[in-house]
Design a protein with these regions (language model features):
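Hydrophobic/aromatic-rich transmembrane helices and adjacent perimembrane loops
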Residues: 185, 322-337, 381, 388-417
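Membrane-interface alpha helices of multi-pass inner-membrane proteins
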Residues: 165-181, 187-195, 216, 220, ...
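Membrane-interface transmembrane helices that cradle and orient dolichyl/undecaprenyl
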Residues: 142-168, 195, 200-202, 276-299, ...
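Short periplasmic/luminal acceptor-recognition loop of GT-C membrane glycosyltransferases, typified by
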Residues: 58, 468-545, 555-576, 605-612
Length: 637
């Protein structure tokens, strides 16, 4: 009965998921930036194109190949990706809830699940895509999900010592290699922690055999993809294909670009360090005051209510969408308190811990997963450098650290504040309902009030994030695309991008042949997908991929297979080192010169793109392409 009741904490997560789905239905994607590639590349692969040969991709091959298979089975539609992502998000929520329930309690696990739900469906910036339903990179999303599965398997391996969980963990790590480098590096950290923990109780030979098993299982997915690519190209190219996410880093890391300097805080490191200290100090004051006042035996009910109201009021009025600078410091505190829990729950003295091999039954299994999760949080947060935040890329990279902070505030910190009691051991300590009995502490009334105040503080913050997202979603009422490909984007009065993209797609479908080819510069592969027009060059996103492939290489691809039409779309390139695409050498200048010599304009909507910042789309046809019939220059509504 208790085991069934422990799952009741998932009900609030389900309610939040339904509410947030209704709030942002089909409003998660951006019509211009990034997400078009997430649709266009799998569509091309489902029609027989070869990844990294016919169409480029900055990231690994796993996600696009998975989506291409879905398109082949269920048909080409945004709905297919939405259904897949919803199922994966639900699986991720239940898995993380179950894992934290085992190492904490229902309140902590439920709050963590709610926080993940809010992040998964949020829009914290004016640009979409930074969510789990229509992500800017499915490789990031899938890699993190696989990392969580890997950690669940590693925790089971540490608990039971069986080979199957380890083999599955190795397979997950191999799949993560095919997503994004930062996720793979982040996943290696908990794997290393698991090996260190096992080293304390396994012989060198047994540990070597275990690692060999993990390595072999990790190579299986790589071998499978290598065989698939080998059927389309030679062995050297196939080997490069399975390393597709890593090869651009050999030419340039992109760290010199303004977007990455701002993301990592390298543009103003001392400012971000100061902000982290201020944020951490403010949180410490709030938590300290709650602990000081609410744990007193003489606390009056009215004072308790006032503290609860103050905690909620402070939180709901704080700018959570820009928060996260103090996450590294919170992770350090969480690691210290986890270490304390580990040592106090250990049945041997410190000296015996250092000298003796330990038997399986002497280990406190609920503490395994938090150790792995904290290692993953540290490693993934490292890419954000001095500027950790839960918005933008932080929706993915800071998510584990954000959940770790909740685990610290609702579980580790209250256990630290509790008074020691005689040790209580459960006959079945791995049951979720008994997880609270495994430590050395009991909960008193004052700490229940303290946890309630922290819970109110966190829930108010999640409400603030939801309200912030809803303000963006309220402005979105313009449909782009139709049927299963429909995206709801900003009203033209707020942002003309969606309306201009819809007009451009309609013009292309009306005035060009279905077999005509199209390239969008410097961004805009959504047009290719919506109109089902192929880009004959491998280049998908000229503006954001120049740093990886080089302008001359991309220009050579265009000259070799010139598209029938080119859509030039307004795009701010300042994040990549220039005010606009085509203004300077190395950032589209030669490409735009080539376009000017070989193409002539046939249609314009809005302002002249890449000139004065006003949004507009101009379509040009190749000089050898027959002139299309149709209107010459409609205006924006």
């Amino acid at each position: 009965m208790k085991k069934k009741l422990s799952w009741l904490g998932a009900i609030p997560m389900g309610i939040a998921l339904i509410l947030l789905t209704w709030l942002g239905w089909r409003k998660w994607a951006d019509p211009l930036i990034d997400f078009g590639q997430q649709l266009y590349v799998p569509w091309r692969l489902s029609r027989g194109a070869v990844l990294y040969h016919d169409v480029s991709c900055l990231y690994g091959c796993l996600s696009v190949c998975y989506h291409a298979v879905l398109f082949k089975i269920f048909g080409v539609s945004l709905n297919v990706l939405l259904a897949s992502n919803f199922l994966i998000v639900i699986f991720l929520l239940l898995l993380i809830y179950r894992l934290f329930l085992k190492c904490s309690d229902a309140w902590t696990a439920t709050t963590i699940g709610l926080a993940l739900t809010v992040l998964a469906f949020s829009q914290l910036l004016d640009v979409g895509n930074y969510n789990y339903i229509c992500p800017y990179s499915h490789e990031e999303f899938h890699g993190i999900v696989l990392a969580v599965v890997m950690m669940a398997c590693l925790a089971r391996w540490l608990e039971a010592g069986r080979k199957l969980p380890l083999a599955l963990a190795g397979g997950c790590l191999g799949l993560i290699f095919l997503t994004k480098p930062e996720v793979f590096v982040g996943a290696v950290a908990p794997f290393a922690v698991a090996v260190i923990l096992q080293w304390r109780r396994l012989s060198v030979l047994d540990l070597a055999k275990a690692l060999l098993l993990a390595v072999v299982c990790g190579l299986i997915p790589l071998a499978g993809f290598f065989a698939g690519f080998r059927s389309e190209m030679n062995s050297a190219d196939a080997a490069r294909a399975i390393c597709g996410a890593w090869l651009p880093l050999l030419h340039s890391t992109g760290l010199q670009l303004p977007i990455y300097r701002a993301m990592t805080g390298m543009d103003a490191p001392w400012h971000h360090i100061a902000q982290a200290l201020i944020e951490f100090s403010g949180l410490a004051v709030i938590v300290g005051l709650c602990a000081w006042r609410l744990t007193r035996p003489t606390l009056k009910p009215l004072e308790r209510v006032l503290i609860f109201a103050a905690a909620g009021g402070v939180s709901v009025n704080y700018g959570w969408q820009s928060a996260g600078h103090c996450l590294p410091l919170l992770l350090v505190v969480a690691a210290i308190l986890w270490r304390r829990e580990w040592r106090r729950s250990f049945q041997f003295s410190v000296s015996s811990f250092q000298t003796e091999h330990l038997k399986l039954e002497t280990w406190n299994s609920p503490l395994f997963f938090p150790a792995l999760w904290l290692a993953f949080s540290f490693a993934l947060l490292a890419k954000l450098g001095f500027n950790p935040h839960i918005s933008h890329y932080g929706v993915f990279l800071a998510m584990p650290a954000f959940l770790s902070a909740i685990y610290l505030l609702l579980h580790l910190l209250p256990r630290f504040l509790q008074s020691p009691r005689p040790e209580v051991h459960s006959p079945q300590p791995d049951r979720p309902s008994d997880a609270g009995q495994i430590g050395l502490w009991t909960v008193d009334c004052g700490l229940k009030s303290f946890r309630a105040a922290i819970l109110i503080f966190l829930l108010a913050g999640l409400a603030r994030l939801t309200i912030h997202s809803s303000l963006f979603y309220t402005d979105k009422d313009f449909p782009l695309g139709s049927g299963g490909d429909r995206i709801v984007t900003y009203d033209p009065k707020v942002d003309p991008t969606g309306a201009a993209m819809a007009s451009a797609a309609a013009w292309i479908e009306t005035n060009t042949a279905p077999t005509s080819t199209l390239a969008a510069l410097p961004q805009g592969s959504m047009l290719n997908y919506l109109t089902r027009r192929i880009n004959p060059t491998p280049c998908v996103a000229f503006g954001s991929e120049l740093w990886a492939y080089g302008e001359q290489n991309m220009l050579a691809d265009c000259a070799k297979n010139p598209p029938d039409y080119i859509a030039i779309i307004q795009w701010d390139g300042s994040e990549f080192g220039a005010p606009r695409f085509g203004l300077q050498k190395g950032f589209g200048y030669d490409v735009m010169q080539w376009v000017g010599k070989n193409y002539q304009p046939v249609w314009l909507i809005g302002g002249e793109p890449l000139q004065n910042g006003a949004f507009g789309i101009k379509i040009l046809k190749h000089l050898s392409t027959p002139v299309p019939a149709g209107p010459a220059k409609p205006a924006l509504p």
